[in-house]
């Protein structure tokens, strides 16, 4: 069982618009950075997708994962239990249910703790995630966010 620290950020230009996410994973001496961009999406989808991709990148189950995010949407949905209420109601009338279902599948394989951090507050890893997310949103060859629904 590893101790993992994860920083995430997501952005969308126009909301909806082109978007991207950035993830920094750290465990002991190991560090991994992940990012990608999408043609049409929202900032909330990119914030949530960053967390999902980070968790999916872990090679084994049962890790202790601390996730630092500046997204109240993601942090509060989990920490305040809203997500589990939505799940009990089969995500009726909930946006991003495709991503929340994907999140739950990987979330339950680890011990995850969320910590909200203020964005643009000079945290080096959060700032790096922000630069990666924005860089990807401005990039060429953006992917399609097939789950996005206006």
Residue ranges and their predicted role:
Residues 1-45, 49, 53-63, 131, ...:
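RNase H-like nuclease fold core
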Residues 8-18, 52-128, 132, 137:
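RNase H catalytic domain
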């Amino acid at each position: 069982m590893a101790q993992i620290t994860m920083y995430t950020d997501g952005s969308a230009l126009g909301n909806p618009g082109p978007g991207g996410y950035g993830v920094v994973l750290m465990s002991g001496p190991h560090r991994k950075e992940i990012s990608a961009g999408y043609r049409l999406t929202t900032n909330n989808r990119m914030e949530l997708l960053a967390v999902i991709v980070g968790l999916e990148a872990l090679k084994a189950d049962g890790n202790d994962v601390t996730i630092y995010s500046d997204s109240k949407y993601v942090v509060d949905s989990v920490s305040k239990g809203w997500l589990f209420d939505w799940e009990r109601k089969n995500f009726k009338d909930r946006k991003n249910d495709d991503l929340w279902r994907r999140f739950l599948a990987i979330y339950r394989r680890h011990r995850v703790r969320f910590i909200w951090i203020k964005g643009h507050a000079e945290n080096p890893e959060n700032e790096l995630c922000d630069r990666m997310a924005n860089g990807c949103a401005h990039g060429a060859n953006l992917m399609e966010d097939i789950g996005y629904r206006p």
